[in-house]
């Protein structure tokens, strides 16, 4: 189904674990050339790359802290130097940072949350834009930018997660502007919006707590990262979604139904 992704050049930010890593694996299985990214070099990087490169594609690790605008540009530059261009950008970097109710939020916390969840996607996309445009023109198809939203972007977030929810809602909104002004360049912009997944995001919860929370969803449980990964392939594939732009695909087990 995703045969047209073979050889495609895919940059995935924040992809050393969880949903991001599952996406790296999925693209590698499809035969793509993929850059895994993270702030820190994983302790098991050598073994991870060996495993990933045995799946059928080519995977490298490019370290960068994408909450820093300067490093966003360097990341894109490093990727293009390695692969010669960009066909697909997945803005997966993000995180809660911490939980603070409104009375406790200060400038430092505001900056940390928005830099990681909003600014990173903006700046990486900004630097990738000319390369995505060039790839679309060269291939005669479309390039793809995939944002990663959240159910919190709809609901406002849980206790102490209001800023996180707002940062994700910002992504839901800014995508509309990018669609309006850059789809003409052969670039499609779409969003994968996960619900509650069993990742490090919920590492503070024990299994009983996760089971209790998950029982309140129609699917009755948390999602697994590998269940979200195929949605990235769908939006990346011109054959599957060449006429789809500006859309949000909610992957949440029925937790929230817009």
What are these regions (language model features)?
Residues 77, 116-139, 179-180, 184, ...:
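Amphipathic alpha-helical dimer-interface segment in Rossmann-like NAD(P)H-dependent oxidoreductases
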Residues 85, 183, 188, 240-245:
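Short, small/polar-rich loop/turn modules that mediate ligand/substrate recognition or access, typified
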Residues 103-123, 146, 171:
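Catalytic Tyr-X3-Lys loop
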């Amino acid at each position: 189904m995703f045969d047209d992704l073979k050889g495609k050049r895919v940059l995935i930010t924040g992809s050393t674990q969880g949903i991001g890593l599952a996406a790296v694996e999925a693209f590698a299985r499809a035969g793509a050339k993929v850059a895994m990214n993270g702030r820190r070099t994983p302790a098991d990087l050598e073994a991870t790359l060996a495993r990933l490169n045995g799946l059928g594609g080519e995977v490298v690790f490019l370290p960068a802290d994408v909450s820093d605008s300067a490093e966003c540009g360097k990341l894109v530059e490093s990727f293009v130097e390695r692969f010669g261009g960009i066909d697909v950008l997945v803005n997966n970097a993000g995180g809660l940072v911490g939980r603070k109710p409104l009375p406790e939020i200060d400038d430092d916390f505001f900056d940390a949350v928005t830099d990681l969840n909003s600014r990173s996607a903006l700046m990486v996309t900004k630097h990738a834009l000319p390369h995505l445009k060039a790839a679309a023109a060269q291939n005669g198809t479309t390039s793809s930018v995939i944002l990663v939203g959240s159910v919190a972007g709809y609901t406002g977030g849980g206790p102490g997660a209001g800023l996180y929810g707002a940062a994700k809602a910002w992504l839901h909104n800014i995508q509309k502007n990018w669609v309006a002004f850059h789809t003409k360049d052969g670039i499609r912009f779409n969003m994968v919006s996960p619900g509650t997944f069993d990742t490090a995001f919920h590492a503070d919860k024990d299994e009983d707590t996760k089971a209790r929370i998950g029982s309140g969803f129609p699917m009755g449980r948390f999602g697994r990262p590998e269940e979200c990964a195929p949605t990235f392939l769908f939006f990346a594939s011109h054959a599957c979604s060449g006429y789809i732009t500006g859309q949000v695909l909610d992957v949440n087990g029925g937790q929230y139904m817009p």
